[in-house]
């Protein structure tokens, strides 16, 4: 497969041309990558008006992903999420009422920023009581989605889209095929934040990518699970996308993107196309198989110590290339287990009061898995001390769903005068900008909602120390 962006930049870097244009480093090495860092010179094409090498490279990606059209982003899935929602709004029938999005609650804060900028309401899908208990998870059933759509219809409102995060940060996956069928029956596009699942298209056992499973539009962060530089992402349009006009899509991306996209990131997306067209899918499957075997060994290791819980979360419905550990099986918090691994030369992706997330790809040498297994075996060999049952937040999350009272629209709250106060003092105040770290960038309380007792309890559990609230005299 061709790599038109890589080829052009390499030829330019080797040409000896005087760089009388941006960027200011002029190709002189400070970090080593500068010779290949260029701007929109003649022949380099323009990301948001692509007709040359970028368009050719995106066409390669479109064929690889099997979409109606795949577009590049150099600003991560955050840019793609905003563009995706903008396009869904543009493609929705005009009703004369405020637009509303039906969304699973475990959404990245980029969704809230989009709601503030595009000024739409959000009706939240909450997990069933038996499925709740973690900030990052929000399983949505066919029945729950059908009921929510019917309730909105009974109110004379049709959402301009259904928005799901799959895979989620802990590796859980929604039943996209079944949920897309529900959306089709109600003539509503399914929009999927697939930031953690770009590789799902390329599993030899069969694609688990949202577009192949019926989603109308989705975004992938190539940099999360493929060998792409940070910021490299894709906006994928399926045949059911509400807007297909190329200029409209590029304008939506441009609305939320810099006019100086990184050509280093574009080259990495371009080079990844060639890699995906070779034996990389087989390497992905090999990585998934090795992780499946590792999960089994870790669970056997923990069981031999008499643990009541499996150490590695494992089920066919889970994302295969993410290893999520339940630290409670070892009598630890996720943060404490992360510290133990850090002391043994390993850095994790995410840790919370209970879970630890480790992300592997084919680029990890086999020694990484061996080092992890040895560190966990050493921890088990010390003996797992008797511990209290892990803190259950199920009731607290259920209470959060009951207490989540919107006082302002997201836009009103985000743009209102605000102040930052200690989280413990925020009871009864209205959330302005969500104060959350990334990862996981999932807010406990969203902009415009009143902060209730359950939120305070979860702030403490997840280490949220301050919150941004609307100044009371301003509404």
Residues covered by each model-derived region:
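Structural signal for conserved beta-strand scaffold positions within catalytic alpha/beta enzyme cores
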Residues: 72, 124-126, 220, 350, ...
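Short, glycine-/Ser/Thr-/acidic-enriched flexible segments
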Residues: 27, 169, 223-225, 240-242, ...
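Conserved C-terminal alpha-helix-loop-beta "cap" of PLP-dependent enzymes
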Residues: 299-454, 458-463
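Conserved N-terminal alpha-helix of the aminotransferase class I/II PLP-enzyme fold
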Residues: 34-79
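Charge-dense polyanion-binding interfaces
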Residues: 467-475
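Conserved PLP-enzyme active-site core in the AAT-like
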Residues: 2-10, 67, 76-311
């Amino acid at each position: 497969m061709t790599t038109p962006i890589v080829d052009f930049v390499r030829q330019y870097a080797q040409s000896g041309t005087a760089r009388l244009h941006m960027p200011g480093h002029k190709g002189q090495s400070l970090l080593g990558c500068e010779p290949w860092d260029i701007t929109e010179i003649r022949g380099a094409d323009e990301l948001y008006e692509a007709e040359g090498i970028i368009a050719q490279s995106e066409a390669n990606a479109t064929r690889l992903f099997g979409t109606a059209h795949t577009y590049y982003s150099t600003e991560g899935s955050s840019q793609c999420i905003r563009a995706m929602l903008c396009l869904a709004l543009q493609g929705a029938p005009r009703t004369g009422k405020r637009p509303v999005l039906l969304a699973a609650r475990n959404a990245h804060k980029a969704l809230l920023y989009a709601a503030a900028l595009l000024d739409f309401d959000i009706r939240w899908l909450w997990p069933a009581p038996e499925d709740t208990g973690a900030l990052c998870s929000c399983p949505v059933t066919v029945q729950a989605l059908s009921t929510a759509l019917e309730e909105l219809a009974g109110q004379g409102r049709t959402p301009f889209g259904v928005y799901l995060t799959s895979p989620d940060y802990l590796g859980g996956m929604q039943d996209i095929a079944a949920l897309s069928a529900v959306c089709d029956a109600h003539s509503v596009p399914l929009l999927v934040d697939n930031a953690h699942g770009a590789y799902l298209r390329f599993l030899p056992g069969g694609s688990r990518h949202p577009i192949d499973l019926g989603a109308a539009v989705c975004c992938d962060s190539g940099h999360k699970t493929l060998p792409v530089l940070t910021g490299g992402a894709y906006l994928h349009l399926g045949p059911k996308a509400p807007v297909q006009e190329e200029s409209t899509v590029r304008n939506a991306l441009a609305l939320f993107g810099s006019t100086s996209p990184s050509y280093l990131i574009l080259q990495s997306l371009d080079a990844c196309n060639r890699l995906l067209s070779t034996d990389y899918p087989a390497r992905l499957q090999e990585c998934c198989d090795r992780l499946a075997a590792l999960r089994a060994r870790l669970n056997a290791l923990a069981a031999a110590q008499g643990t009541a819980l499996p150490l590695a979360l494992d089920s066919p419905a889970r994302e295969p290339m993410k290893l999520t550990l339940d630290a409670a099986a070892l009598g630890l918090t996720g943060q404490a287990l992360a510290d133990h691994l850090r002391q043994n030369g390993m850095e994790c992706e995410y840790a919370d009061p209970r879970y630890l997330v480790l992300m592997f790809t084919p680029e990890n040498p086999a020694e990484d898995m061996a080092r992890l297994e040895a560190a966990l075996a050493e921890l088990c060999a010390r003996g797992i001390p008797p511990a209290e049952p892990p803190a259950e937040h199920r009731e607290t999350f259920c209470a959060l769903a009951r207490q989540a009272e919107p006082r302002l629209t997201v836009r009103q709250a985000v743009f209102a005068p605000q102040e930052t106060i200690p989280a413990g003092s925020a009871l009864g105040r209205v959330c302005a900008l969500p104060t959350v770290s990334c990862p996981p960038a999932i807010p406990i309380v969203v902009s415009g909602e009143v902060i209730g007792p359950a939120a305070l309890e979860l702030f403490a559990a997840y280490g949220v120390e301050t919150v941004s609230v609307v100044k009371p005299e301003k509404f």
